[in-house]
Amino acid sequence: MDLLVLVAPLLMAQAPDLQVGRHVETVHQALISQGWQVSDAARRAEPLSARQRAIKAWVPSLITCSGTGAGLCAYGYSRQGDNLRLVSQGDGELVRWQLGDDWYGAGVASR
């Protein structure tokens, strides 16, 4: 049996290579190229403000953004039964992410 046939499902189940501080638009393009899709929750979400409409126009996985504080935004993806949620700061930098029940990231990205 071909080794790729045996290893491919394991590779698909691994967490994507995400890094605190990467811009969410860059992360979105990478996830889509890795076979992730915009989640049902993100497809159903309707932007509540002009800012959210602008974000959703370039990152369709947007679920919502907070209206106060750091302006954190949540994005949703799914792939083969796995759910991935991203959280970015208002400027679009990735802060943390959730794959299944597990959270990753170190809070606010340092420069």
Where in the sequence are the language-model features?
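N-terminal secretory signal peptides
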Residues: 13-57, 64
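A generic structural signal for solvent-exposed, polar alpha-helical segments
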Residues: 42, 64, 81-83, 103, ...
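N-terminal hydrophobic targeting signals that begin at the initiator methionine
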Residues: 1-2, 19
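Functional cores of ribonucleases/endoribonucleases
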Residues: 55-92
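Sec-dependent N-terminal signal peptides
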Residues: 2-12
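A short, surface-exposed interaction/processing loop segment used at functional sites
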Residues: 90-111
